[in-house]
């Protein structure tokens, strides 16, 4: 077993600054070559403290940014122009990436498409609501206006 200090968040393992023990092969072939971790040493405690301090500062700043962006997203509806037939039925469906692109086009900032949660498949024009997880503690509800375009 190898004792490592994580420099980045690794899903299922820990966050930056955590000290973890993993199998030698996982450390040697995945974590260390990709720069996700450093080998543990006696002087590594200083590195752990600096990484954790940077993570706390970054999380605090990202929480404030997420709250500001959530207020902006909730205040204004986002218009999605999609191809649709005469009856209002869409040619395809609205996906998370479409919502993220529409938010960016509306000037409300960039959001990750993986953070968008659609209530159901959107297959016709109309008004819908979507949830966006901007931070672990911050979620915003976006009002989507799906309209027929070219």
From Swiss-Prot:
Keywords: Ribonucleoprotein, Ribosomal protein, RNA-binding, rRNA-binding. GO terms for biological process: translation. The lineage of its organism: Bacteria, Bacillati, Actinomycetota, Actinomycetes, Micrococcales. GO terms for cellular component: ribonucleoprotein complex; ribosome. GO terms for molecular function: rRNA binding; structural constituent of ribosome. It holds the Pfam family Ribosomal_L9_N. Belongs to the bacterial ribosomal protein bL9 family. It comes from the Bacteria. Binds to the 23S rRNA. This is Large ribosomal subunit protein bL9. The gene is rplI.
């Amino acid at each position: 077993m190898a004792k490592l200090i994580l420099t980045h968040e690794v899903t299922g393992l820990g966050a930056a600054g955590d000290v973890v023990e993993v199998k030698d092969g996982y450390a040697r072939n995945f974590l260390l070559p990709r720069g996700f971790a450093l080998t543990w040493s006696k002087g590594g405690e200083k590195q752990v403290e600096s990484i954790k301090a940077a993570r706390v500062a970054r999380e605090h700043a990202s929480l404030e940014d997420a709250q500001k962006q959530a207020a902006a997203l909730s205040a204004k509806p986002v218009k999605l122009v999609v191809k649709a037939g005469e009856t209002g039925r869409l040619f395809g469906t609205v996906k998370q990436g479409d919502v993220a692109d529409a938010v960016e086009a509306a000037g409300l900032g960039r959001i990750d498409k993986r953070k968008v949660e659609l209530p159901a498949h959107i297959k016709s024009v109309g008004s819908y609501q979507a949830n966006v997880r901007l931070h672990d503690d911050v979620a915003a509800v976006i009002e989507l206006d799906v309209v027929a375009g070219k």
